[in-house]
Structure formats: structure tokens, C-alpha cells
Amino acid sequence: MDSGLGGLSVLREAIKLMPKEDFIYYGDSLHAPYGVKPQAEIRDLTFAVVEKLLDMGIKGLAVACNTATSAAVRLLRNTYPELPIVGIEPAVKPAVTESHGGRILVMATPMTLKQEKFQNLLAKYREQADIVPVQCDGLMEFVEHGDLDGQELDDYFAEKLSPVLTDDTESIVLGCTHYPFLKKELRHFLGDRDIHLIDGSLGTSRELMRRLKVQGLLRTDCLLYTSPSPRDRTRSR
């Protein structure tokens, strides 16, 4: 689930890792964006979506929204202890692990950056790297509206990133599942700068697969159907 279309970036990786599973995707575009709403409202919206998914018979859940993860995933796990639940968070750890001492920008919604979960990440890794949060209110709407390139998007990147881009900036963490769909235009904006773009879609999908496997829920069977060969038809006469 996600607040809109962004979680499709996680679904894409999950399908690659678990091709034998059946997936249901719920994008709550009616209430998007979550990232500018109060925490209590985000929690209520997330629970409403999860209850719909449970009615559909799901056996596992990926909360493919950084904002919903921060606001609700802990309470979801307490409420549904038997359900494998994974969330997503800005991929700060991989960025720091791969860092060579340069600046790391973290693009995310205002609510994600404000939440305790991100603040704990920041506190944990701030001594190891120069981490700069970049508040990107309004960016996910470009994806929701299908505006994945163009001058308006370039102008947005210029407004948000130009003040914090330095010669030693080495990575940008895409801290919202919508943002990977903007990679091409972001690279166009960055030009010839050698900056690594990092997102958490693959890591979230791997964790979902791991939890399903631990609980014996991962589907590994495969059904094969064939039409009779000419030789088989001859034998049956």
C-alpha cells in the first residue's frame, strides 16, 4: 500500500524477487499526499487501507510509504502481530555505508523528516557523514499527475537542491517511494555531477520476502500445464 502511485516502485522489485506470489496494490490517491497531514490522520488513513486489504485475504503487508511507515507501522505490528509487516524508510544506512566522506542529501516529505523514526536515523549516522535533509513538499504530486519531466520539474529541483548541492555531494537519498519515478529528470538536472541516487525499494522487498520465508508463507510451488503432444495423442488411441 501507499498514499498513491509511488509504492509501485516497491511492487516492481517485489515481483522480481517473488514472481510466484500474487500481489494486491492499494494506492490511496483520494487522500494523497499523506506527507503534509497530521500524524493522527495519517495513522487513521493507513489503518483504513490495511483493513480493506485484510478483507481481501492478504498474508503479508508492505507499507510502501515513508510517511505511513513513520506514523503507523509500529502500531500496525502491535495490532496484527501474526501478519508479516514491513515498512520503508529513507535509505540513509546504505548511503552512509557507501559514503567516501561526501555530502548526503535526503529528499523526503515534511512529515517523514519530522517523524521520530527519521530523527533517530539522523542521530545514529550524523557523526559518520554530512547528512542534509531536503524538505520536498509537493514533489510527489508530479508523479501522481504523470508529470515526470519538463521545465516545471527542473525548476522545482533547482529551488530545492541548488542551495544544498556542493562539490563534494556524493549521493541523494530518494526518501519517498514516488521519487524513483523522477530519477531520469533528476539526473538531467544534475548534469555531469557524479552523484549516486539511492532508494529503499529493493531493501523493503527483500525484507518482506525474508519475513514471509521465516513464517513459512513464501510461495515456491509452480503449476505446469501443457497441451498433449502428437505422440501422446497417438498413444491414447
Task: Spell out what each predicted region is.
Residues 1-227, 231:
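Non-catalytic structural scaffold of enzyme domains
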